[in-house]
Amino acid sequence: MSKLIEVFLGNLWTQRFTFARMGLDLQPDKKGNVLRSPLLYCIMCLTTSFELCTVCAFMVQNRNQIVLCSEALMHGLQMVSSLLKMAIFLAKSHDLVDLIQQIQSPFTEEDLVGTEWRSQNQRGQLMAAIYFMMCAGTSVSFLLMPVALTMLKYHSTGEFAPVSSFRVLLPYDVTQPHVYAMDCCLMVFVLSFFCCSTTGVDTLYGWCALGVSLQYRRLGQQLKRIPSCFNPSRSDFGLSGIFVEHARLLKIVQHFNYSFMEIAFVEVVIICGLYCSVICQYIMPHTNQNFAFLGFFSLVVTTQLCIYLFGAEQVRLEAERFSRLLYEVIPWQNLPPKHRKLFLFPIERAQRETVLGAYFFELGRPLLVWIFRTAGSFTTLMNALYAKYETH
């Protein structure tokens, strides 16, 4: 049993598992092609795109009903998010695979930080598995709750009347049992795509943020050994190794920022609408409301937001901690003034590059406040419109 748990908590196990369910390989061969099964991936994308079109058609038909439109908007935005994130992931797959290798490479040695990396990585995989269970619970409750209610109604009344909380305008009649079964099969692909794409991409971002943070800690461990090897007689004062490692780490941060910038931007923009739609479902309830799905989905959206914002915040804090340690450890009083400026100015300027962004957004705690305020403003507006036009 312990061996099985150790496998599940292995490096990138959750990410590799979820990407494999979509026909992708996160650790490809030398050719670097991550798309292992194009047919499976295309089926998932096509079924999701089809359901997105039916959601848009429903919103157009019911554009005067705020509650129904907000629920359809919630489903539509999540499908748009999944499609965009996976499209960006495929477009930048080579960069992401290279980023994974760069983050892993310093932790191969059997040192203290390598041991900490394995420990933190196992903890991260445990959190990723919990997040996967949240996404799976969202998908399962979304499909099984309406099916169970439909079967219960059929058993009690003998009438086949499908119950659904998915607001779509389908081009076929789901009141026929065989058509309803086919529609459920389509939804299996859609919900699997949502679950795996959300878990895979989001937890991969969290894994990269964890790796970069631990590399800063590793650099800090090297910095603490500086007093013993500081040599004023050398032209580089014995500090060249630290500066080389710091420059390499800054390149990794820049690579990390470049690889995930578009994905993070999609998350920030779409999550405001998602929060607004989710809140509206709680404050403006209606018939056939799937509260099990809403509960799981609320957890997923909140965790999703925390992964991106607090992950970026952790990288920034580790960089600041390294800067403070740099000033504390290096004997600046033994350096000539011109060398102090030569060392300090580039390092101070380089620290600004550790702020992870999403185009014109800077990921961190201030952005979290902005997202909640924006979602709250949209919710207040929709609630006012609902009270004015639909409660009288």
Swiss-Prot record:
Extract the Pfam families matched here.
7tm_6
Supply the alphabetized keyword list: Cell membrane, Membrane, Olfaction, Receptor, Sensory transduction, Transducer, Transmembrane, Transmembrane helix
Per the record, membrane topology reads: Multi-pass membrane protein
Membrane side Extracellular: residue ranges: 61-75, 147-177, 278-287, 381-392
Q: Which residues lie on this side of the membrane: Cytoplasmic?
A: 1-39, 93-125, 199-256, 309-359
Q: Name one GO biological process term.
A: detection of chemical stimulus involved in sensory perception of smell
Tell me which positions the record assigns to the signal sequence. Answer: none
Name the GO cellular-component terms.
Answer: cation channel complex; dendrite membrane; plasma membrane
Q: Write out the annotated subcellular location.
A: Cell membrane
InterPro entries in the record: 7tm6_olfct_rcpt (IPR004117)
One GO MF annotation is: ionotropic olfactory receptor activity
Q: Which domain of life is it from?
A: Eukaryota
The residues that cross the membrane are 40-60, 76-92, 126-146, 178-198, 257-277, 288-308, 360-380
Q: Where in the body, by tissue, does this protein show up? A: Expressed in olfactory sensory neurons in the maxillary palp.
Tell me which family the UniProt entry assigns to this protein. Belongs to the insect chemoreceptor superfamily. Heteromeric odorant receptor channel (TC 1.A.69) family. Or1a subfamily.
This protein's assembly is summarised as: Interacts with Orco. Complexes exist early in the endomembrane system in olfactory sensory neurons (OSNs), coupling these complexes to the conserved ciliary trafficking pathway.
Q: Write out the function statement from the record.
A: Odorant receptor which mediates acceptance or avoidance behavior, depending on its substrates. The odorant receptor repertoire encodes a large collection of odor stimuli that vary widely in identity, intensity, and duration. May form a complex with Orco to form odorant-sensing units, providing sensitive and prolonged odorant signaling and calcium permeability. Involved in the behavioral responses to butanal, heptanal, and 2-heptanone.
Misc. remarks from the entry: The atypical heteromeric and topological design of the odorant receptors appears to be an insect-specific solution for odor recognition, making the OR/Orco complex an attractive target for the development of highly selective insect repellents to disrupt olfactory-mediated host-seeking behaviors of insect disease vectors. Odor-evoked OR currents are independent of known G-protein-coupled second messenger pathways.
Q: What is this protein called?
A: Odorant receptor 1a
Q: Which organism is it from?
A: Drosophila melanogaster (Fruit fly)
